[in-house]
């Protein structure tokens, strides 16, 4: 049996992203999303989650992305830049973390605060993942999985896309190498999660083409979907031009949203006997 979790990241980051995710859920086949508890529009996202109780909701642990922490800046200063925000990306964070400049006590306190903020919102949390996949980095993954067990969140994203998978997406060698490194870290994280009795999808898609998916590329993934539970990570939103002026990632938010509204892809789900599910299917 083929099952697919279509998980929209960055819920709570911006109203146009929130609106795109909900549109993709109500009118398309997005089945799950990941709430950023420290993001500027997280309260709007919580309200939308409460209005759409069948939408799977994960916690998108955030240690990067130039957003503010949940805890006061003075309590987690080793995680932040001079403006009191998280570092811009995983590369900057990894350099600081592996140089020994991040205090483990501050890291754990902030991750706990993010999980607890989501739990206090009274929404059913289906899983844990993270912004730019920092939760699978060696040295952080063990802490995150410990917290999963402690807070009884028994499912986790494992972003282990197959090393050779392209799905028709053409890119440079640098992106391929980056994906390979992440998949290797995710493979180690999967082994650790399995040893702790945590659950995760068997397959993962959407890494190499992250932020650049469209109807054709999603269709290619559906055509090649293996048996079992697969996660497809996506980043839908409304008005790519407006979002592109705010965020530097050059994502194609509108195209990603349209991929799940596309009538051809909806028919493909039926033709391939693919069941849309959320993380509770793991």
Regions inferred by a protein language model and the residue ranges of each:
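Active-site pocket-lining segments that scaffold enzyme catalytic pockets across diverse folds
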Residues: 135-137
